[in-house]
Amino acid sequence: MSLTITSSVTHPELKDLSTVRNEQKELNISPVHDVNVTKATATFGMGCFWGAESLYGATRGVLRTTVGYAGGSSDLPTYRKMGDHTEVLEIDYDPTVISFKELLDLFWNNHEYGLTTPIKRQYASLILYHDEEQKQVAHASKLEEQERRAPEIITTEIASKENFYPAEAYHQKYRLQGHKDLASSLNLSPKLLQTSYVATKLNGYLAGVGGIEQFKAEAETMGLTPTQRQYCYYHVEQNEGQGLYC
């Protein structure tokens, strides 16, 4: 179904979820939680992982994001007992749409605490490569960035990705979870909060990343009903350009 979305004068509500359920049944629409394409994975630490997850979620070619803990040696870290791990974002992406180098370009330019200021391990700047090609691209990219920023010294660590521990459910898709009725209408289990395609995209767009025109272009891929899309349109438009925050 093709839908022309127009801005609403009043704040759209999703309190009555029966409207969404009826649309899903009548239009044979369901939220798209998985996209069947060949994926590659990248893992970055760049400060608070809430903002990073929104940034990459609304990026074209990104299919899934999960926040978690990695880069250390302690077992089973949690937010309250992180040990020597760092807050990181794991990204599944379509390499035919966006490259690892392009993901790195976003990485270098969107650190919450900057690249040249030493910071505690929790918020460290970190690239965890998944294969030899990523290792080479990461080191070359860091060298280019260091030359660009000289005489400042980039503190980013590059290491092999070993264990990754998903963060607690309340950290996953944090901006989307702030829209409780919308999140409920998407049938998101704790596992789907980590893996869902539509949750990944909306977590970025609802935070103001990507913009309204890009949202319109991608909305068809998400399995949203007219009511869900109208709600999202309003909030994407309201939040566009606000900038990332934690």
From Swiss-Prot:
PTM (free text): Conjugated to URM1, a ubiquitin-like protein.
Keyword Ubl conjugation: yes
Organism: Drosophila melanogaster (Fruit fly)
One Gene Ontology molecular-function label: peptide-methionine (S)-S-oxide reductase activity
Name this protein carries in UniProt: Peptide methionine sulfoxide reductase
Superkingdom of the organism of origin: Eukaryota
Catalytic residues as annotated in Swiss-Prot or TrEMBL: 48
Reactions mediated catalytically: L-methionyl-[protein] + [thioredoxin]-disulfide + H2O = L-methionyl-(S)-S-oxide-[protein] + [thioredoxin]-dithiol; [thioredoxin]-disulfide + L-methionine + H2O = L-methionine (S)-S-oxide + [thioredoxin]-dithiol
Disulfide topology: 48-246
Gene Ontology BP annotations: cellular response to oxidative stress; determination of adult lifespan; response to oxidative stress; sulfur amino acid metabolic process
Reported induction: By ecdysone.
Keywords: Disulfide bond, Oxidoreductase, Redox-active center, Ubl conjugation
EC number assigned by the record: 1.8.4.11
SUPFAM superfamilies in the cross-refs: Peptide methionine sulfoxide reductase
Gene3D superfamilies: Peptide methionine sulphoxide reductase MsrA
Keyword Disulfide bond: yes
Function, in words: Has an important function as a repair enzyme for proteins that have been inactivated by oxidation. Catalyzes the reduction of methionine sulfoxide in proteins to methionine. Does not catalyze the reverse reaction involving the oxidation of methionine residues.
GO CC terms, sorted: cytoplasm; mitochondrion
